[in-house]
Amino acid sequence: MWQPATERLQHFQTMLKSKLNVLTLKKEPIPAVLFHEPEAIELCTTTPLMKARTHSGCKVTYLGKVSTTGMQFLSGCTEKPVIELWKKHTLAREDVFPANALLEIRPFQVWLHHLDHKGEATVHMDTFQVARIAYCTADHNVSPNIFAWVYREINDDLSYQMDCHAVQCESKLEAKKLAHAMMEAFKKTFHSMKSDGRIHRSSSSEEASQELESDDG
């Protein structure tokens, strides 16, 4: 039966009021989210996005990289490249180098965050795959504070070259800590490769373990 608009509106308001009364009589607690104000919900979702990104790692001075030859990386193999990088850096600056990077060793990757003049991490970051690091050490005659690693860099034409990267740490202890952290990353990467089936024979396992070698002195 047709009803005027005012009567339909009154009927709707009466039904809504009765439903609200039923809800208030229920003993089950209403979910707490219903009592949150819109402003509070908005703050909860946006506040974490506004926080500055923090990085855990060791502040270092990145000395650069230099190509190296050979496939067998034994103790002392980074001495010559490190001396070359050290000389280039000492010619350009004083004996005291300000930290310009943050080295972060993760289970399967090494992140080198570049710092700005305020000492804060920038968006520029170099990434190294642990599986392509052939050797690392914190034992150098030119300075006990230097940590270096040999990395297999793959070019655009799929050829590769071995580069020696070096950083100067704040102390000898920090350099040793980086070497030990890298060794732990080696172990996790090796076990992951083995469990994924990328290492099949025992001989291949021995070769992989020799390639992922660390010498912390």
Swiss-Prot record:
UniProt cross-references to InterPro entries, sorted A to Z: PH-like_dom_sf, PID1, PID1_PTB, PTB/PI_dom
Keyword NAD: no
Coiled coil: none
One cellular component (GO) term of this entry: cytoplasm
Primary site of residence: cytoplasm
PROSITE patterns documented for this protein: PID
Gene Ontology BP term (one): mitochondrion organization
Subunit text: Found in a complex with PID1/PCLI1, LRP1 and CUBNI. Interacts with LRP1 and CUBN.
Name of the featured protein: PTB-containing, cubilin and LRP1-interacting protein
Lineage: Eukaryota, Metazoa, Chordata, Craniata, Vertebrata
Gene name tied to this protein: Pid1
